[in-house]
Amino acid sequence: MRPSLQPLGLRCRLSVLCAGALLGLLSGCSLLPQAEPNDVYLLPGGVSPQASGGPAVDWSLRVAKPQANQVLDNSRIAVLPHGSLISSYKGARWSDAGPVLLRDRLLETFQADGRISSLSSDDRQLQADLELVSDLRAFQSEYRAGQPEVVIRLDVRLVQSASHKIVAMRRFEVRQAASSARVADVVAAFGQASNALAGQLLTWTLQQGQLQARNLR
């Protein structure tokens, strides 16, 4: 006796019906987690282009992106809610990695001042007399007595490009209280702290760069 065979067309129709039923069962659920929407923040409070009026220096400077650990070298907005626990603000992120934002703020500040006219970044490996290299140790908000405070800590080295010799080094730390625990207010405090640190670093770099230039004469 021959085995009973279903016509090919019937088998195809049954397969389509089964697939459709399966898709209908799955349509009410998601097999993959939905991406959480993020608010993307620029680092606020950029300086207005305003020259210092002081004489231009005769040396060039390259500003390198600060080195940082994996917690800080990303676009998450870091927060220490208590103790040594580090987290990030849910549903919010920076427009770029923290070290890039800080380097660009330094460049903006130096360019607006105008005294270091021969200025470049490590994005373009142009020749420069001195290089500003650094390690970003903190770029986060920390809660103090229930209120957020932004902390930026940067270990800086001024290096002779030709000899790779460190000619000056210093730690900079700025703290800026946020006006509230709202993410937008914490972000505003990041901008204020970054501006303050950039101003301090500009003054120090000019002093150390001029001292180094005199020593080379």
PLM region spans:
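Bacterial N-terminal signal peptides that target proteins for export
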Residues: 2-18
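C-terminal motif of bacterial Sec signal peptides marking the signal peptidase cleavage site
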Residues: 25-28
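A structural "domain/chain start" motif
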Residues: 30-99, 208-217
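Surface-exposed short loop/turn segments
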Residues: 32-50, 57, 108, 113-163, ...
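Generic short beta-strand segments
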Residues: 66, 135-139, 173
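Short secondary-structure boundary motifs at beta->alpha junctions and helix caps
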Residues: 85-93, 162-203
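Extracytoplasmic/secreted envelope proteins and their assembly/folding machinery
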Residues: 99, 103-107, 113, 194, ...
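Surface-exposed helix-capping loop/turn segments at secondary-structure junctions
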Residues: 112-119, 203-217
